[in-house]
Design a protein with these regions (language model features):
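S/T-rich, low-complexity, solvent-exposed segments of bacterial secretion/appendage proteins
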Residues: 1-352
Length: 352
């Protein structure tokens, strides 16, 4: 499916082409402004979809971290009980209960499990930070800085970033930061560059009312897509649409200058329509990658589950570790896939 915003931009340029043969035609001038409004609303809509998806991902991340912290605290509490029970020659039921919770934690993020001689465990992140050790747990937090989500671990010297969380939470971080925020940043850049080029041509031209120096579009820097609008000086005012480069009736050089923007390369590369379609293509590639990663991890899960069921009476530590890693990969891939499919369907107008 074609990206709706790219279609709307194309329709605007087509309307300008129709106006160029009769630049004073009031009906065609109104049509150009109507198409410009369509472009603006489409940019705002896409930004809104991305913004809502980011809010949803952040909310899900915070909920899952709350549940994760409860599990981590429970592991630490059980370890305190396990240490005493093991010293007295028991503790198997407590260990089984704790291990089930460790499995849940491992689905949420990458952790290495180090078994202690006293029956307790140490849970260590991929970058070497202890979450649980010696019956003590550290708090995991979701932080947001300049729109970017990250996970941190509490410490005596302050919160420390978890570089590679992995698992379901790692998938959510990727979906938020790399996919949704990345697409929004690209969309903002394209919107701002497009408006800037169109405004340069429009402000140099004259409307049929004889005035000049007016922008066609307005936007807020850094939020170009969500704030994109037809400038108030032109909106709903066909006579204010600049078509003449000289002020003379029948001249269309200002209109032609705006039409030239269609095929001109923007600073970020490619034309405006190519750039918007590029965002669509990037989301499509992300979906394909997530599906492939999920299928690979699911295959590993099936193999390891079968192995775990068929082998008895031997140490299964390595197999269980591999199984947990496969679960993490599957969870991460599915989180990215779910979020990206929602954005792809909505932004690229499969549901509009």
């Amino acid at each position: 499916a074609e990206a709706k915003t790219a279609v709307r931009v194309g329709e605007l340029f087509d309307a300008m082409g129709a106006l160029s043969s009769q630049p004073g035609d009031a009906v065609r001038r109104r049509d150009v402004l109507s198409r410009a409004e369509d472009v603006a609303s489409s940019f705002r809509r896409d930004a809104g979809v991305l913004g809502r998806e980011m809010t949803s991902i952040e909310s899900t991340s915070r909920d899952q971290v709350d549940a994760l912290n409860k599990d981590v605290q429970q592991i630490a509490k059980l370890d305190q009980e396990i240490r005493q029970a093991v010293a007295g020659g028991g503790g198997n039921d407590l260990i089984d209960e704790r291990n089930r919770i460790v499995g849940r934690v491992a689905e949420q993020m990458n952790v290495q499990v180090v078994n202690g001689k006293d029956g307790t465990v140490q849970l260590v992140t991929e970058d070497g930070r202890s979450i649980v050790e010696g019956g003590q747990a550290r708090e995991i937090k979701v932080q947001k800085n300049n729109g970017v989500l990250s996970l941190t671990l509490s410490g005596v010297s302050g919160d420390q970033a978890i570089a590679k969380p992995g698992g379901a939470l790692g998938g959510l971080m990727t979906a938020h930061n790399d996919v949704a925020l990345g697409a929004l940043n690209d969309l903002n850049t394209r919107a701002e560059e497009f408006a800037t080029e169109m405004n340069a041509a429009h402000s140099a031209g004259f409307g049929t009312d004889g005035a000049t120096g007016r922008n066609l579009f307005s936007f807020t820097l850094g939020a170009g897509a969500s704030s994109f609008a037809v400038d108030a000086a032109v909106a709903g005012k066909p006579d204010a649409l600049a078509t003449s480069g000289t002020g003379a009736a029948g001249d269309n050089t200002a209109l032609r200058a705006m039409m030239d923007v269609r095929d001109a390369g923007l600073p970020s590369g490619g034309t405006i329509e190519e750039g918007i379609r590029g965002i669509q293509q990037k989301l499509g590639t992300t979906i394909a990658d997530a599906v492939r990663n999920g299928e690979t991890s699911e295959s590993s899960l099936q193999q390891l589950d079968a192995m775990k069921s068929s082998v008895e009476g031997v140490s299964m530590e390595e197999e269980i570790l591999n199984l947990t890693q496969a679960q993490r990969g599957y969870e991460a891939a599915m989180k990215v896939l779910s979020a990206t499919e929602t954005m792809f369907d909505s932004i690229m107008s499969l549901k509009s």
